[in-house]
Amino acid sequence: MLKCESRTGLPIALNGVDAAPKSEVYKMFDTSFDYNSEMVDRLCAALLTLKTPEECRAFLADVCTIGELQDIAQRLTAAQLLSRGRNYQQICAELGVSTATISRVNRCLNYGAGGYKTVLARLEGGDGQ
């Protein structure tokens, strides 16, 4: 049986930074990777060429390991559940992810670049703006 800790609120590292711009908080955690590199631009362009779920599945099957794809899918589902008000313990039990993963997703939802919010809004029928 999976045992999870229940957590509420933000990770300790974010306490006291509510006044900082979200982009600055996000940069504090993601400084070692260049999200604007030519390789990332190429990946984004490749994703934007995909037109159907079948094309997307085929590309992801070629590009990602099963574990990587499962991790990405679990993170997106965790983001959906967090945005619907589910708590860490419920998400941990349902998805089998660690509270550390849920905490990272929560941090990105609240202080990230806005990618989760855009995708979730569009999946729910909004424009994501």
Residue ranges and their predicted role:
Residues 39-43, 59, 77, 101:
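A general alpha-helix detector
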Residues 8, 55-74:
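Short, Lys/Arg-enriched anionic-surface-contact patches
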Residues 90-95, 102:
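Short alpha-helical "recognition helix" segments of helix-turn-helix
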Residues 14, 89, 117, 122-125:
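General marker for long, soluble alpha-helical cores
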Residues 1-50:
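General nucleic-acid-binding
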Residues 50-54, 66, 85:
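Residues at alpha-helix boundaries and the short loops/turns that link adjacent helices
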Residues 72-86:
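Short, amphipathic alpha-helical "recognition" segments used to contact nucleic acids or chromatin
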Residues 99-122:
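C-terminal structural segments of small proteins and small subunits
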